[in-house]
Design a protein with these regions (language model features):
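Nucleotidyltransferase catalytic core that binds NTPs
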Residues: 1-215
């Protein structure tokens, strides 16, 4: 009997709500935000990474963070551990989400980029990449429709000491819209390489990562 009255009360409130929506208008939804996609990172999620995400959110973007499986060129942590670090570091940030593992995205494969764009129909999609990556990654040496260089980008200005004399500019390679972003020198120095070195030497990494993932 109690369940009957509970259901009746619920239906009564639901009916009133639907009536109010019909008479006063429905919900007013805000326009969908543009999407910023972080391609897979092989590194521990540093304080610099988090600061970049915070700045992008402040500029009105919805951020998706992907975690790649493996890199031959870097000494990586286990994928699930890196994914957990990213999740814990970004948990306090609004409009920041982990990108699903089930949808691999390779910037060098136009079909993957097409699939990515199709996930966010009617929304502007931006890829987040550092200027050093754009100048040196093989994905940006390709030309033609649908390649990485034709996508919109949030460009992170970085000084690459190994290519300091390179006259090329990342902006000249990119064909889509470009939103430029730079970090204070302190956050640039909080690199994943430094984090790994500190861990190997049993040194405190509290200033290099979010405090919630330090242990």
């Amino acid at each position: 009997m109690l369940a009957f009255f509970n259901e009746a009360a619920m239906l009564n409130h639901l009916y009133r709500f639907m009536t109010l929506c019909e008479t006063n208008g429905g919900f007013a939804y805000e326009p969908l935000k543009p999407v910023a996609f972080f391609p897979g990172t092989f590194d521990p999620f540093s304080a610099g990474h988090k600061r970049i995400v915070e700045e992008i959110v402040l500029r009105g973007f919805e951020v998706y963070l992907a975690v790649d499986e493996f890199s031959w060129s870097k000494r990586t942590l286990a994928k699930l551990l890196r994914r957990q670090i990213v999740s814990m570091s970004a948990a306090s940030l609004p409009d920041v989400y982990l990108f699903p593992d089930e949808i691999p995205v390779n910037l060098a494969v136009p079909d993957d980029l097409k699939t990515l764009a199709g996930l966010f129909c009617d929304r502007e999609l931006y890829i987040v990449a550092g200027s050093d990556v754009i100048l040196n990654a093989s994905a940006y040496r390709q030309s033609g429709p649908g390649t990485a260089a034709t996508c919109n980008h949030i460009l992170l200005s970085r000084v690459d000491a190994a290519h300091a004399g390179d006259p090329r500019r990342a902006e000249d390679i990119l064909k889509g819209k470009v939103v430029s972003l730079s970090l204070p020198a302190y956050y640039e120095s909080a690199s994943s390489t430094q984090i790994r070195d500190y861990i190997d030497k049993d040194m405190d990494i509290g200033m290099l990562v979010d405090p919630v993932v330090q242990d």
